[in-house]
């Protein structure tokens, strides 16, 4: 069976891994890095950049450079957290027709283009897919993609949509802490252990309590409880620092950098760099010359930042991670002292203040033998190998992070599946009508822990109609909830009297209909096609350039031996080729290059013959004519070798 790759689709960085010969390998991207920035940029000439290249041009293209998109995936525009983000990012977040949070960028014609978060995330997944394909040497179709454990149903569905748009068959969506536990637990000694995975990434925080046990020779990974906050991560730490630096600058210079997208982007980069530096040093300087200007001239930002200052700015963010830890331990039915190991995942856990908070809560040092940037992708690759049958002794028992239920009389949420229930799972309950002769019921599906229906996340609603008229409380409507291994919910309602049934796969709030997803798949494929054509055009230009250089060199080497007619004929073809290279017609460039090749190959033969004679051939026309005759008798593909010969001879002359 073909490999199933593991992808950690992160808020800040993404990573891809694959299992080969029983070992997991994290794959380096084209730039040689094991992680890729989850950044997508749309340039003014219509190119789509992903990763390091997108990050590099962010300062000069701030409103078209999209980062931290994972914070918007599966979210409604009116969510408080989205509204907060709108004020903080240089790109434009808009309300889609269905109420979801989308992004608006200008295309190369300057027209507004609306993009759904799964569509943008798909570009990162395409890069991850290509990275794996370049390494493996063949096409990759199947993947396991990770999501934060505390992602709700619509966020999971939106992630699956992103995979589909990227041309991937998403075999499984698994939780990031569970993946990290797989990476940690696979090579550990036998025996039961209870571990806490503390995952503080770029945009989300998760805590999972996982029991690793040996059951009949199998590694069993059972998630006992999970908790978290899907809008708390390294980006929030950066924002605190950006606000502080902007505030200090405003105090000193009277200019608010929040109003200048270019300055804000430079400040973001500097804040991120300073935060990372302060994990290993006690102080750093944030130095940004010419950050902005006013009537009095250019302004420079130069602020000394200490680790203590940074820690005081983010103290409450670190503290916010502890409450979910308490809840998860309680839900798992354990005491803190019963946790054997603590694993840190996510780049933000490198901050000493975070490590100290974890140590104080769990009463032990976190393990350092797990790479916080790569563990999740490694775990996803292991799960991929389990699904493909390459690994046979692993059983993964994950849970649903939030309770699921429906709205009942009085605006109450009635839970059918409690949080931390092992998945896949199925539950049903019988409900009835609220009014006499009621012929239809609306099933409103909710996810969350609050008693009030309105305080929970609405996942979707559907109607069951044609119920025979009867007094209230008489009809029996059986509602069934079925969660698959991806944590995605299927709901059905059945009238027991008539057998009539209505069902729904919860995807309404992921915002994308099947038609929209299909359209985005086609768009992505078209984009891949245009990318391929672009690369072919660049290759054609490069080959043409090399041919022009070779022809001009031959003319120069032969000097006065080239007749005026020959020279003008070659110059004419060279000029025509240069003109073709300015355009975008690959075939025209190829045709002109071939014409130049025909002209220059004759010159090349003469250069070769001349050099051959100079290299010590016996005097006389016969010896000089031999290489000429041979070269003339052979096909064009010999021409390259002839040029090599010239270079070698030149080098020998230089060495002398």
UniProtKB/Swiss-Prot annotation:
Keyword ATP-binding among UniProt keywords: yes
InterPro entries: ATPase_NBD, Chaperone_DnaK, Heat_shock_70_CS, HSP70_C_sf, HSP70_peptide-bd_sf, Hsp_70_fam
Taxonomy, superkingdom: Bacteria
Keyword Glycoprotein: no
Modified residues annotated as Phosphothreonine in this record: 204
Keywords carried by this UniProt record: ATP-binding, Chaperone, Nucleotide-binding, Phosphoprotein, Stress response
Low complexity biased stretches: 620-632
Stretches for region Disordered: 602-656
GO MF annotation list: ATP binding; ATP-dependent protein folding chaperone; unfolded protein binding
Induction text: By stress conditions e.g. heat shock.
Biased composition (Basic and acidic residues): 647-656
Family, similarity comment: Belongs to the heat shock protein 70 family.
PANTHER family the UniProt entry points to: HEAT SHOCK PROTEIN 70KDA (PTHR19375)
Primary role: Acts as a chaperone.
Descriptive protein name: Chaperone protein DnaK
Organism for this UniProt entry: Coxiella burnetii (strain CbuG_Q212)
């Amino acid at each position: 069976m073909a490999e199933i790759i593991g992808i950690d689709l992160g808020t800040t960085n993404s990573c891809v891994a694959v299992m080969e010969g029983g070992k997991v390998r994290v794959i380096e991207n084209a730039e040689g890095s094991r992680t890729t920035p989850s950044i997508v940029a749309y340039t003014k000439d219509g190119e789509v950049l992903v990763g390091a290249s997108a990050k590099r041009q962010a300062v000069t293209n701030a409103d078209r450079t999209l980062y931290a998109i994972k914070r918007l995936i599966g979210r409604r525009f009116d969510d408080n957290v989205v509204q907060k983000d709108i004020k903080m990012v240089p790109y434009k977040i808009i309300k889609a027709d269905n109420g979801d949070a989308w992004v608006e960028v200008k295309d190369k014609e300057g027209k507004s283009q609306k993009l759904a978060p799964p569509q943008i995330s798909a570009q990162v997944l395409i890069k991850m897919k290509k990275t794996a394909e370049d390494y493996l040497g063949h096409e990759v179709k199947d993947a396991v993609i990770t999501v934060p454990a505390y992602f709700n149903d619509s966020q999971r569905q939106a992630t699956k949509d992103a995979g589909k748009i990227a041309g991937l068959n998403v075999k499984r969506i698994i939780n990031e802490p569970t993946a990290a536990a797989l990476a940690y637990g696979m090579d550990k000694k036998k025996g039961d252990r209870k571990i806490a995975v503390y995952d503080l990434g770029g945009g989300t925080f998760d805590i999972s309590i996982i029991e690793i046990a040996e059951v009949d020779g199998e590694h069993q990974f059972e998630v006992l409880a999970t908790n978290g906050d899907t809008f708390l991560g390294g980006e929030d730490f950066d924002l605190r620092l950006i606000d502080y630096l902007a505030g200090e600058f405003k105090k000193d210079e009277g200019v608010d950098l929040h109003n200048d997208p270019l300055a804000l982007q430079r400040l973001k980069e500097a804040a991120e760099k300073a935060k990372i530096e302060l994990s290993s040093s006690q102080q750093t300087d944030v130095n940004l010359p010419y950050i902005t200007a006013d009537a009095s001239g250019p302004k420079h930002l130069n602020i000394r930042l200490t680790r203590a200052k940074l820690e005081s700015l983010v103290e409450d963010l670190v503290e916010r991670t502890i409450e979910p830890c308490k809840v998860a331990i309680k839900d798992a039915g354990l005491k803190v002292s019963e946790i054997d190991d603590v694993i840190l995942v996510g780049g933000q856990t490198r901050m000493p203040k975070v490590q100290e908070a974890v140590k104080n809560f769990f009463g032990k040092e976190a393990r350092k033998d797990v790479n916080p940037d790569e563990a999740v992708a490694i775990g996803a690759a292991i799960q991929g190998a389990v699904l493909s049958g390459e690994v046979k002794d692993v059983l993964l028992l994950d849970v649903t992070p939030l309770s699921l239920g429906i709205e009942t009389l009085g605006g109450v949420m009635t839970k059918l599946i409690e949080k931390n229930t092992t998945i896949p799972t199925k539950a049903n309950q019988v409900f009835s009508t609220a009014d006499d002769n009621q012929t239809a019921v609306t099933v409103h599906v909710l996810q969350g822990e609050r008693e009030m229906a309105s305080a929970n996340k609405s996942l979707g609603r559907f109607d069951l109609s044609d119920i025979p008229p009867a007094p209230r409380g008489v009809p029996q409507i059986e509602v069934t909830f079925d969660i698959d291994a991806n944590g995605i919910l299927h709901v059905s309602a059945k009238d027991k009297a008539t057998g009539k049934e209505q069902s729904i796969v919860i995807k309404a709030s992921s915002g994308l209909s099947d038609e929209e997803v299909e359209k985005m798949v086609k768009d992505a494929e078209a984009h891949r096609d245009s990318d391929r054509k672009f690369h072919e055009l660049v290759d054609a230009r490069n080959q043409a350039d090399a041919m022009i250089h070779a022809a001009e060199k031959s003319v120069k080497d032969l000097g006065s031996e080239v007749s005026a007619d020959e020279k003008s004929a070659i110059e004419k073809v060279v000029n025509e080729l240069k003109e073709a290279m300015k355009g975008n017609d690959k075939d025209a460039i190829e045709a002109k290059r071939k014409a130049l090749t025909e002209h220059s190959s004759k010159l090349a033969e003469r250069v070769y013959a001349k050099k051959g004679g100079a290299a010590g051939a016996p005097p006389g026309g016969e010896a000089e004519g031999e290489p000429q005759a041979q070269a003339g008798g052979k096909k064009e593909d010999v021409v390259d070798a002839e040029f090599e010969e010239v270079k070698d001879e030149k080098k020998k002359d230089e060495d002398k």
